[in-house]
Regions:
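Charge-rich amphipathic alpha-helical interaction elements
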Residues: 1-144
Length: 144
């Protein structure tokens, strides 16, 4: 295996590792978006389930329920910018993953081409070595 093949093999291995890391980071970013969206949905459901108790109720209990409803709404609305930011970060990580995959595929093609050239060169050397030996044998046979 010549130097070019070793270099291309090493490059392909590095690109595979880089793609794996980029895919992991992209998956984490997508998971964060999913978690935030799930949290927002849970807050919406909690807010929807807040109902005043039937029967006599004190003003303090109504005030506490109103305060809780306001806090749930506020938390849900404040998740919007965070989710948008997480989505843009996830999109950026996905773009990085695609670029890493493209680099990996390119490195694998270069590695395959280098292997093919090395194999052809080895076959060529074998053919030339075979011809050289045959002509030596003919010369030895003629001198006998």
């Amino acid at each position: 295996m010549n130097g070019l093949v070793r270099q291309r093999t090493r490059l392909a291995r590095v690109r595979r590792i880089q793609h794996g890391l980029a895919a992991s980071v992209a998956a984490q970013a997508a998971g964060r978006v999913q978690m935030l969206e799930t949290s927002r949905e849970r807050l919406r459901k909690l807010r929807g389930e807040l109902r005043p108790v039937e029967g006599p109720t004190t003003g303090a209990a109504m005030a506490r329920m109103g305060e809780l409803a306001m806090r749930l709404d506020s938390a849900r609305y404040n998740l919007g910018p965070t989710i948008d930011s997480a989505r843009s970060a996830a999109a950026a990580r996905e773009a990085e993953r695609r670029a890493a995959r493209r680099d990996q595929e390119s490195a694998e093609k270069l590695e395959a081409a280098a292997l093919r050239v090395a194999e052809e060169a080895a076959e060529q050397r074998l053919r030339q070595a075979g011809r050289g030996r045959g002509s030596i044998r003919l010369h030895q046979g003629e001198s006998e």
